């Protein structure tokens, strides 16, 4: 897990891209602030595209959860660990700076549990088994393209299974923009 606000997240983008390429479960908290550049510490939503379109180099995506208040922030942070572990993907909890500055009591609930796949990728020592490597550098004809196809299939599955939204005041609307 790591956390920061806007410019700090930008500095972490190479590592986040590496984690996505290596399929490492990581939770990232980004409490957005004003920008561009160093900006200010006022609430802002300027990191939306960076988070949702893959802010570092390469063909990758993150799962992005965006809480609207402190309780949902607490709930989504717990859920982020489950999602990261289940899909082997970085998950970003992306909060407006205003949410990051709010104070109210929260209840730390257990997130919905999933049956997790075996961690046969984890580096736990090689005693009694073949060595494992965590990489995001793929060399050789077609190796990277095949890896990107595998990741794309995962992203499509996540989009199909995990996309969610809250509808407010849309009854009777012909069109709703998200």
Model-inferred region functions:
Residues 1-12, 21-30, 66, 176-178:
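A short, small-residue-rich loop immediately preceding and capping a beta-strand
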Residues 3, 8-14, 37, 73-76:
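Short glycine/serine/threonine-rich phosphate/pyrophosphate-binding segments
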Residues 15-26, 42-52, 107-114:
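A glycine- and small-aliphatic-rich helix-loop capping segment at beta-alpha/alpha-beta transitions
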Residues 17-25, 31-34, 53-57, 75-89, ...:
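Generic secondary-structure signature for well-ordered alpha-helical cores
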Residues 24-35, 114-123:
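A glycine-rich helix N-cap at a beta->alpha junction
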Residues 41-44, 50, 57-59, 152-178:
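Thiamine diphosphate
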Residues 43-97:
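Conserved thiamine diphosphate
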Residues 88-167:
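Conformationally flexible catalytic loops at phosphate/diphosphate-handling active centers
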């Amino acid at each position: 897990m790591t956390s920061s606000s806007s410019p700090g997240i930008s500095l972490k983008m190479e590592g986040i891209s590496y984690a996505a390429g290596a399929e490492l479960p990581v939770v990232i908290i980004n409490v957005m602030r004003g920008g561009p550049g160093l900006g200010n510490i006022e609430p802002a939503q300027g990191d939306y595209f960076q988070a949702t379109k893959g802010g570092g180099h390469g063909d990758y995506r993150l799962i992005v959860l965006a809480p609207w208040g402190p309780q949902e922030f607490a709930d989504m942070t717990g859920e982020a660990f489950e999602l990261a572990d289940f899909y082997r993907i970085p998950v970003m909890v992306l909060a407006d700076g205003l949410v990051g500055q709010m104070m109210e009591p929260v209840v730390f609930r257990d997130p919905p549990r999933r049956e997790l796949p075996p961690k046969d990728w984890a580096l736990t020592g090689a005693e009694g088994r073949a060595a494992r490597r965590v990489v995001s550098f793929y060399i050789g004809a077609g190796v990277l393209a095949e890896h990107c196809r595998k990741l794309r299939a995962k992203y499509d599955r996540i989009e199909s299974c995990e996309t969610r939204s809250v509808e407010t005041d849309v009854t009777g609307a012909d069109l709703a923009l998200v």
